A protein has these predicted regions:
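Acidic, Ser/Pro/Thr-rich low-complexity regulatory regions
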Residues: 1-123
């Protein structure tokens, strides 16, 4: 797959990546107090459950945000898109061709696309 896209999309990605990162972190932190930690379990078991859950969120964060490079932009943007971290008007800032490619990649990767903008709270 070619990783060619307009320079304007790369610049937009650089701007919106930071916004999406803040939204992702806020979402995770907002979920922690609601994390189901059954009181029948020991503190250690609950800790391990939370640790495992945070590890899964960290894997998601890495997929979408670690080591941003031009060669990774489309895959990272597909993850950001699938996680519902961009508002529709923000996603619309990318060229139609890039948006289409991102949607196809997200689908091919099996990532369930969240309703764009529903969870995209302001950081």
């Amino acid at each position: 797959m070619q990783h060619e896209f307009p320079e304007s999309d790369w610049k937009t990605f650089g701007e919106l990546r930071l916004v999406a990162l803040e939204r992702f972190c806020k979402r995770v932190l907002d979920e922690v107090p609601r994390f189901p930690l059954e009181t029948e379990r020991s503190y250690h078991q609950r800790y391990l459950e939370l640790f495992r859950w945070l590890g899964e969120r960290n894997d998601e964060l890495a997929k979408a945000f670690d080591d941003p490079r031009r060669s990774q932009m489309l895959w990272q943007l597909a993850a950001i898109y699938a996680y519902g971290l961009l508002k529709p008007d923000e996603f619309a800032r990318f060229t139609p061709h890039t948006r289409e490619r991102v949607q196809v990649l997200a689908q091919e990767a099996g990532w369930r696309a969240a309703q764009q903008g529903d969870d995209a709270d302001e950081p």
